[in-house]
């Protein structure tokens, strides 16, 4: 009976040991293990400076984006104005072509009439 009791106590100790291992406090590690406060402070300072750099970079990129948007709007406006100008010039070309055709027909008719008149005078 004593051996059974000792065996049971050993099993209980083993179970308690495993149980304690399950609920050990977990130490949070950021990068390499930080053992003292000076390392933590250095890390905080480094992270803050990195954050400031990233904020500056964000500002620069926002400025670049604003400039590109302005350039895009300017180009879009110019494209619209050039399209309008192109349409106006196309209309003018069409009108001038029609007018030229009418003038050529009138001139040809006049020349034909003059030629016919000269032919009649010869006969």
UniProtKB/Swiss-Prot annotation:
Which GO terms of the molecular function aspect are on file?
Atg8-family ligase activity; identical protein binding; protein-macromolecule adaptor activity
Recorded coiled-coil stretches:
57-106
Q: Which CDD domains match?
A: Atg16_CCD (cd22887)
Q: Name one GO cellular component term.
A: phagophore assembly site membrane
- Keywords from the UniProt entry: Autophagy, Coiled coil, Membrane, Protein transport, Transport
Pfam families the record matches = ATG16 (PF08614)
Q: Which GO terms describe its biological process?
A: autophagosome organization; autophagy of mitochondrion; cytoplasm to vacuole targeting by the Cvt pathway; piecemeal microautophagy of the nucleus
Answer whether the UniProt record assigns the keyword Ribosomal protein to this protein.
no
Location of the protein in the cell: Preautophagosomal structure membrane
Q: How does it sit in the membrane?
A: Peripheral membrane protein
Q: Which domain of life is it from?
A: Eukaryota
User: Is Lipoprotein found in the keyword set?
Assistant: no
What InterPro entries does UniProt report for this protein, alphabetically?
A: Autophagy-rel_prot_16_dom
Its biological purpose is as follows: Stabilizes the ATG5-ATG12 conjugate which is necessary for autophagy. The ATG5-ATG12/ATG16 complex is required for efficient promotion of ATG8-conjugation to phosphatidylethanolamine and ATG8 localization to the pre-autophagosomal structure (PAS). Also recruits ATG3 to the PAS. Involved in endoplasmic reticulum-specific autophagic process and is essential for the survival of cells subjected to severe ER stress.
The similarity annotation says: Belongs to the ATG16 family.
Subunit text: Homodimer. Part of the ATG5-ATG12/ATG16 complex. Several units of each may be present in this complex.
Q: What is the name of this protein?
A: Autophagy-related protein 16
